[in-house]
Each structure stands twice: as structure tokens, then as C-alpha cells.
């Protein structure tokens, strides 16, 4: 037990220094303790403690179910009192199951929620979107935060939360019900939309195709799909690009579901927040390639947001010291609009 306490203290030191060698040494010792505890009855009580330290090193991804309340403010200055929040959303993050990564709240979600609320709060009333579609909603934080804030500004505001995985959809509906939100939960398969939008069949194979489930019709029947003719003022997507093909699929979804510019709503937009991870640079590059100036949609603005993400272990962070609140992370906020000379532009 004293050994576990010492290792827990070392885990805190490794977390602060982000020392990969130290962290690996700790994992080796902890795995040996777990193995020893599993084979020696007198040391069985070591298993739980050693395992808890391993979870601590693994970060949020290894945690079980938990509830967390997020508060959003119009001013960036801290500290703040929760009573000053213009929106607050309680979210349940479920335990990771298989490929259902969206069941956890990734670090990009609260940053995109805050940015959009602050942006719309400083805009003219006629710019406020009436219909919002969230892609790859995951735990639903972005859509639910917008639904709460927009609902207080205009009574006709409506937010639709979408995802693909059955486990994620079940948790998404749970969060929507817990927040007493008027947001709808729907199933949406980006790849199916992409294929429907193609004039010729294209054969390709991606990692996502190998890992994602194939019960699309089942989940559409259970949760309802998004009508192919539905159009929205704004589309939002936080940390949804984890395969280079996804940007292409999202482009197809935007072509189908993003409102064309009109006099009443001249600037429909797709907002994407993409974390810059050294393991996913190809995915980031795909966004620039797909939404280039030659596309019907193009990137109108790019903003950099600095923040923290405690989803993974310290090894996923940069070489800078790791803050207690998570791994430092840089996100790119893409504001994507219809190209003015696009044939799709109204």
C-alpha cells in the first residue's frame, strides 16, 4: 500500500513534467503490481489501488460514467460566479465502449460552444440562426448549449443533434432529456449522404469503414433521420474529423442541409472546430483541401483557439508541461460559407 501511495505521488509529478520515460516506468511498475495482486491473495487489495493510478495516468478516456456541468459566459474574464452564466448544461459522459468515442465530451466542444454563444450575443438579432444542425454531436454539449441560449433569444429556435453510433445516440438523448431541451436527436450517416450526392459510384476503403457499425437503417428507424429536404441556417461540428474522408462526407452533408443565402438570412455557415494533433495532421489537411476556394463551399475565416483537453494521457500532449486541467491543445475554428459565385448560391 505504501508502494501504491508513492507511485500515486510519482504519477502527479510525471503529469506535471510530462516526462514520457517517467510515465512509462510508472506504468510498468503498476502493471507488475496488478499482476502480483491477482496471483497472491494477501496482496489482492493492491489491485484496485494500482488500477486507479493507471486510470489517473490514462486521463479522461479511461474513466467510467460521470456527470459534469458546463457554464458559459459572455465575458472571458475569470473568476466568475455560476449565476452569471448565460447557459449551463449538465452532460453525462459514458464509459467508452468499442468505437463509440462520441460518448465522451472532447475538449473542442466547450470551446466551440462558448465561441458561438459569444459571437451571436454580439451580433444583430436578425443574424441569430433559427435552425441549427450539429454533426457528430457526441455528448451534445455544443448543440444543447446553443439550444439553451438561442431559446432564450428567440422562441422559434430549434436545434437538431445528430450522430451515427447507437451507444452515442442513446446517451445523446439522455443528455437532451436531462437538460429539458427542445433539441431533437436524430441519426445521420454522413457517408450515405455523400454516396447519394455522387453522380457515379466511387469505390474506396477507409479506416472508418472498418470500424464503424453498419446498422444505419436500424438506428434511423429508432431515432429518426434528417429529412433530405431539411435545411438549416447553421451547421456545427466539434472535433469530428478523425479520418481524411470525413471532410469530404461533411462537405456533402453541408451541400444538402445548409441553407442557401437569402435576403432574410444572407450568411448561412458551417462552423468546424478541429484540434491540431500531431497524430492527425492528414485529417487537418483534408479540411483545407476539401473546402478550398475551388469548392462550392470555402473557408471564409480561420481562428486559432488555445485550450486544454484531458481526453488522453500525458503522452498525447505537446512537450510543454501539462496543466492540471488537461493537455494543452490548439484548435482551428473554420467558418465555412457558400462561395459567392457557386452555382448553388441563391
Residue ranges with predicted function:
Residues 1-346:
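S-adenosylmethionine-dependent methyltransferases
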